């Protein structure tokens, strides 16, 4: 005898009618059990020698919100240069090899900009978006979220030294 098809909506209604009731406001909007949110934004270009463009660099603010036990702070803000991201990637690859996690692949960073217009607003914003996507990809990996000391230091330490 064929079973009657029930759409998801009718199944949901039958569950709710069996004493489960409507979910409360706090259940709907409660903090997730474990979360890690990372944003790379607010790029700033620095001219260390006053008006001389030699030595100019751009850094980016990384904001992290988390309740994961491997992190020491629930909210952290740090500023990082592109070279810091490069060093972080190298340290992360080394940590992964030492922990023998062959299935963790660290993606490549967005390409280094060698053009003379690397400090234009459009180029800086394109890089920021690339670094944001890259950082979310790396931080979104479950093994790295729960076990990477290098990731925690990069996100939380005022100065990243590996």
Swiss-Prot record:
Residues 38-161 form the PX domain. Required for retention of late Golgi membrane proteins. Component of the retrieval machinery that functions by direct interaction with the cytosolic tails of certain TGN membrane proteins during the sorting/budding process at the prevacuolar compartment. Binds phosphatidylinositol 3-phosphate (PtdIns(P3)). Disruption phenotype: Abnormal retrograde transport to the Golgi apparatus with proteins missorted to the vacuole. Sensitive to neomycin and trifluoperazine; sensitivity is suppressed by knockout of ANY1. Its main location: cytoplasm. It is a peripheral membrane protein. It comes from the Eukaryota. A 1,2-diacyl-sn-glycero-3-phospho-(1D-myo-inositol-3-phosphate) binds at residues 81, 83, 112, 127. Keywords: Cytoplasm, Golgi apparatus, Lipid-binding, Membrane, Protein transport, Transport. Belongs to the sorting nexin family. Pfam families: PX (PF00787). Monomer. Interacts with RBD2, YIF1, YIP1 and YIP5. Residues 1-23 are annotated as: Disordered. It is found in: Cytoplasm; Golgi apparatus membrane; Prevacuolar compartment membrane. The keyword Transport applies. The gene is SNX3. This is Sorting nexin-3. One of its GO terms (molecular function) is phosphatidylinositol-3-phosphate binding. Gene3D superfamilies: Phox-like domain. GO terms for cellular component: cytosol; early endosome membrane; endosome; fungal-type vacuole membrane; Golgi membrane; protein-lipid complex; retromer complex. GO terms for biological process: endocytic recycling; late endosome to Golgi transport; protein localization; protein transport. InterPro entries: PX_dom, PX_dom_sf, PX_Grd19_PX, Sorting_Nexin.
